[in-house]
């Protein structure tokens, strides 16, 4: 991989997918040693590790920091035990609160996530829960509105009748507005549809995705995007862990596939990602990736409807537009 990427410096490392906090910290230490041996790493590199808030995993936080981790992203999802059980989480609310405090003790940067628009959730209940989360003084929050999609865990649970009494569209919109208002007032404005941060505390790693930057995906089933020789490629490693490991150990190239992205693919990908961001689409970036401009008639209609804003060098979605992002994208693609 080092031979392909060349002398590029690393800005971010992200241990995610599955439950990386189950790894022994010594494994993280060996990975970080190998990374520093192969690439240039800046002094302010962001090293994030996703973690569950169980007491066992939280007990490893100090050793993860010693291994080089400087940011934790904790999968909390709810701050009360009944809802945690409803969504199938094994930790308790007390463990979640303890894990957040432990992470803040050792790491400079801590994020955690919550899911809202859950069963029987009222606007008042969400206001109280989010206020409790903000009182923990995080510098970053990921707040995901529960959506039901086919093929997902929640989709299967919904089809099986295990998610009754979900909020309707009007209440879901009210919950979204409550989220934006509370976080803005607390100094954590939304920089992306579901992500809120204090200034300069945004997730640098996720911004690379949303800005369509280059990133290397390592591990079974990992995806990546790499620009080599002026061509942007989508990479995908084989999903079976044993097959992936054999490919790495034997140096076989077929354990990872790479597809050159067309100009149309790059335009669609950038629009889908950048319109999630408050900063919006940079027109020069869109042109550099795909050689195309957005359709003027579509921009005009969306602007008139109050779904986008526009300046000389960029455009983006308004809060209303982000609520109906799929409709905005249909007009532009």
PLM features per residue range, with description:
Residues 1-290:
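C-terminal scaffold of the Radical SAM
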Residues 281-283, 297-300, 310:
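Charged substrate- and nucleic-acid-binding regions of tRNA-handling and nucleotidyl-transfer enzymes
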Residues 290-304:
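Short amphipathic alpha-helical interaction segments
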Residues 303-313:
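A short, conserved structural fragment
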Residues 314-319:
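Minor-groove-contacting beta-hairpin "wing" of winged helix-turn-helix DNA-binding domains
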Residues 320-333:
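Short, amphipathic alpha-helical interaction segments positioned at domain boundaries
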